[in-house]
């Protein structure tokens, strides 16, 4: 069994049981955003966390061990995404990426926003013209160093 197969089993079981990521996260004791990323194979769980996830998704000990292995993060295909929702993020970075870069550099200097020392919050924002998706990303600024 591979990590991808474990991820596929998690997703299939989630659908079959009608589970919500927020409910799973509450049982694990972490945010819904981080827990979802972990269950989709992008983060590493502790033994205790893997045990909780394993119980929820009826994973064997061998399958739970895959959840504790450091994954190849960002392992989506390198081609332009075809899923409409993921494509919109690709499009967002294509359109606003240079703006993000300019404004971050203007505010902080030459460096990057960490995706390691990072947190994200996704919420529904009621709006008269139709509900909106509100995503807040917070990453530590890491300046480039001279040497």
UniProtKB/Swiss-Prot annotation:
Listed A to Z, the keywords are: Lyase
Which is a GO BP term held by this UniProt record? cyanate metabolic process
Q: Enumerate the Pfam families for this protein.
A: Cyanate_lyase, CYNS_N
Keyword Lyase included in the entry's annotation: yes
**Catalytic activity of the protein:** cyanate + hydrogencarbonate + 3 H(+) = NH4(+) + 2 CO2
UniProt GO molecular function: cyanate hydratase activity; DNA binding
Question: What SMART domains is this protein classified in?
Answer: Cyanate_lyase
Give the residues annotated as active site.
88, 91, 114
List the PANTHER family hit by this protein, alphabetically: CYANATE HYDRATASE
Instruction: Please give the family membership noted in the entry.
Output: Belongs to the cyanase family.
What biological function has been recorded for the protein in this entry?
Catalyzes the reaction of cyanate with bicarbonate to produce ammonia and carbon dioxide.
Q: What is this protein called?
A: Cyanate hydratase
